[in-house]
Amino acid sequence: MEPLFLDSPMHEKIWGGNRLKTEFGYDIPSEYTGEYWAISAHPNGVSYVKNGKYAGFHLAELYKDKPELFGNPKTSVFPLLTKILDANDWLSVQVHPDDAYGLEHEGELGKTECWYIIDAEEGAEIIYGHKAQTKEELASLIEAGDWDGLLSRTPVKKGDFFFVPSGTMHAIGPGILILETQQSSDTTYRVYDFDRRDDQGNKRELHIQQSLDVLNLGNPENSVPATVKTLQLESTCLTSNSFFTVYKWKLSGLVDFKQAAPYLLCSVLSGNGTMTIDSRIYCLKKGDHFILPNDVTDWEIDGQLEMVVSHPNEA
């Protein structure tokens, strides 16, 4: 039994920057690198195992061929995706469909997601919901381009958390570094892209009708995270919903853990330490991402670290 440390793809974006390199030391393809798909089995960017007996396997292959590592799940598709996003400019104002709409129209799951704010510049903000009271008002404000009248802006700071269910109008603003936990989907409907053009002089495609089909009325409710503290561990349940549960762990010393989920997706956001599994010691550092599979029933971590950890739930 051993952890699965991962090597994962980068994605360049019109709104990306270089903080994936400056903050985490990752090799990036350009100064417009927007996303690191840190734990992914999605065909648009698959993680590879880089250690142990499964070194060289990609995650989708391992999930299909070795289901026992994941608790013999009912689903044939790895359900979650962990990303780090570096927003050097506004992302498009967008929305994601739910599972029913996504499967019918795009052939893949919808996307419910959540954001942990790793860092944010002073004055940074996101778009989180909208002000329209009816579908008719929503369509009218979009058609008129009355974005100030439509969009709900929310200031953010380091350590904030936001739950973004499917159907939520949203956008991430410049100066924000985010860890995103989401359903494994790459379907995005753009409502507004700030009229910008790519390096070829073209505006990016918008998806107004699809957006109107799936947008929710009203703003999402962002629950208050619950924290449990011991001497060496501060464990905060950021969200638990029908798709996933996400925790933030702040460790300051030696902590023993027992597996209470089929498997865990783990990301080290700061600090360093060691993890011991079956008498084997693994070094942990900022920027590491790994899976603790089903056969890892207990382990200990020693060090000063902040981590975000998640597991899937039955939808």
Task: Annotate each predicted stretch with a short phrase.
Residues T82-K83, L91, E113-Y116, R153-T154, ...:
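His/acidic/aromatic-lined binding-pocket segments of jelly-roll/cupin-type domains
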Residues L151-F163, D278-V296:
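Short acidic-glycine-tyrosine-enriched beta hairpin
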Residues Y189-L254, A260:
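C-terminal amphipathic alpha-helical segment
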Residues M1-Q133, D195-E221, V246, A315:
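Transition-metal
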Residues S140-D148, S270-T274:
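Short, structured beta-strand/loop micro-motifs enriched in basic residues and often containing a Trp
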Residues V77, L85-W90, D99, L109, ...:
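Ligand-binding loop in jelly-roll beta-barrel domains
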